[in-house]
Curated annotation (Swiss-Prot):
Segments forming domain S4 RNA-binding: 334-395
Protein name in the entry: Tyrosine--tRNA ligase
Gene3D superfamilies reported for this sequence: HUPs, RNA-binding S4 domain, Tyrosyl-Transfer RNA Synthetase
Top-level enzyme category: ligase
NCBIfam families reported for this sequence: tyrS
Length: 401
């Protein structure tokens, strides 16, 4: 494949590319590039938001390039100094290694292990002396740091910014120097840090890396970016039926965006779906089922995707309950709030109370609206929590206290 053809593929769905001319020239001159992605080992659970960048990395691999996956063990072990949010807990070296292993296992569902070089930035950052840090810090100015949106906002509002926070973009940039990256990828929120990498590489006599950013996708709520902390995420490790169901719950407005960024469906076909939905000649639900099937198939295989689709049609389109569901045995009466927590349907009593008060809990199809309801251990009932969680309760006559 010619360099021009490679660039045409690689720039697809990209937000920032600095610059296309440099990328083309670098491929022509070097052939195989070193493509960098830095990852945070304190959060090893990957979701579809991470898949956007990982899929672009896989495109580089399929074209013969090498992906350098940098695990930020140095950062994880010293903790996040930022005072803006809850401080990230410091991790031991053992915890970092375990999280890195979990991250790899999930990332390799998309990446090719044979074309992935795994590095820990503690390899070089642990060895830096204080003099080395001063030299690194001298290569960037406070004025330039304050061009970053979050720093500028906090400075304007008089919110403290620790000197150590300025060192984090520099540490990330030095990673690029250490592994001599040709390209660095990230979400659009990483643009500033990636550009710092270009500058620092130049300061150390290296050719500056090409910067490539990918869109940040909204979560299942269609409003906030996909994040575990927002509870709107779809995890790589979600069971097939849950993954399919979550995808079917996204707003119609996200269907095309998800298709472009998360599937290999040809662009011509995606454009056809987009046109037909605008013309109202196709039901968005049917297009969403194609999307849900394709993503579930990618992560769980053809057979599991088919079963997940059949389950969805049976339970949610025909309003039937599944044949198989977890069985919960109770030997004494249980308050509904306590029961939800015990079976794992809610993570806390406050969440359980919220589920009940918001009308998300049903027994035998009847909504429970009182947190004082109890379930008696005589008979069998079907408990539904939200749209997708079903439990068979052995016992089951409900009684209001």
């Amino acid at each position: 494949m010619t360099p021009e053809e490679q660039v045409k593929i690689l720039k697809r769905n990209v937000v920032d590319l600095i610059s296309e001319e440099e990328l083309l020239d670098r491929i022509k001159r070097k052939g195989k590039l070193r493509v960098k992605l830095g990852v945070d080992p304190s959060r090893p659970d990957l979701h579809l938001g991470h898949a956007v960048v990982l899929r672009k990395l896989r495109e580089f691999q399929d074209l013969g390039h090498t992906v350098v996956l940098i695990i930020g063990d140095f950062t994880a072990r010293i903790g996040d100094p930022s005072g803006r949010n809850e401080t990230r807990p410091m991790l031991t070296k053992e915890e970092v290694l375990e999280n890195a292993k979990t991250y790899q296992e999930q990332a390799f569902k998309i990446l090719d292990p044979k074309r992935t070089e795994l590095r820990f930035n503690g390899e070089w950052l642990d060895r830096m002396t204080f003099a080395d840090v001063i030299i690194l810090a001298s290569k960037y100015t406070v004025a330039r740091m304050l061009e970053r949106d979050d720093f500028a906002k906090r400075f304007k509002e008089g919110i403290p910014i620790a000197i150590s926070e300025f060192l984090y973009p520099l540490a990330q940039a030095y990673d690029s120097v250490a592994i001599q990256s040709d390209v660095e990828l990230g979400g659009t929120d990483q643009l500033f840090n990636l550009l710092v990498g270009r500058k620092i590489q130049e300061e150390y006599g290296q050719e500056p890396q090409i910067v490539m950013t990918m869109p940040i996708i909204e979560g299942t709520d269609g409003k906030l970016k996909m994040s575990k902390s927002y509870g709107n995420y779809i995890a790589f490790n979600d069971p097939p039926e849950e993954m399919y169901g979550k995808l079917m719950s996204i707003p119609d407005e996200l269907i095309i965006k998800y298709m472009r960024l998360l599937t290999d469906i040809p662009e011509e076909r995606i454009e056809e779906y987009e046109r037909k939905m605008k013309e109202k000649t196709i039901n968005p639900r049917d297009v969403k089922m194609v999307l849900a099937y394709e993503i579930t198939r990618f992560f769980h295989g053809e057979e599991n995707a088919k079963k997940a689709q059949e389950h969805f049609v049976k339970v949610f389109q025909k309003k039937e309950i599944p044949d198989e569901m977890p069985v919960v045995e109770i030997s004494q009466e249980k308050n509904i709030v306590d029961l939800l927590v015990e079976i794992g349907a809610a993570s806390s009593k406050s969440e359980a109370k919220r589920l009940v008060s918001q009308g998300g809990v049903y027994i035998d199809g009847e909504r429970i609206e009182d947190i004082k309801f109890t379930v008696e251990p005589d008979g069998e009932r079907v408990l539904r929590v939200g749209k997708r969680k079903f439990y068979r309760i052995s016992g089951g006559e409900t009684k209001k206290l």
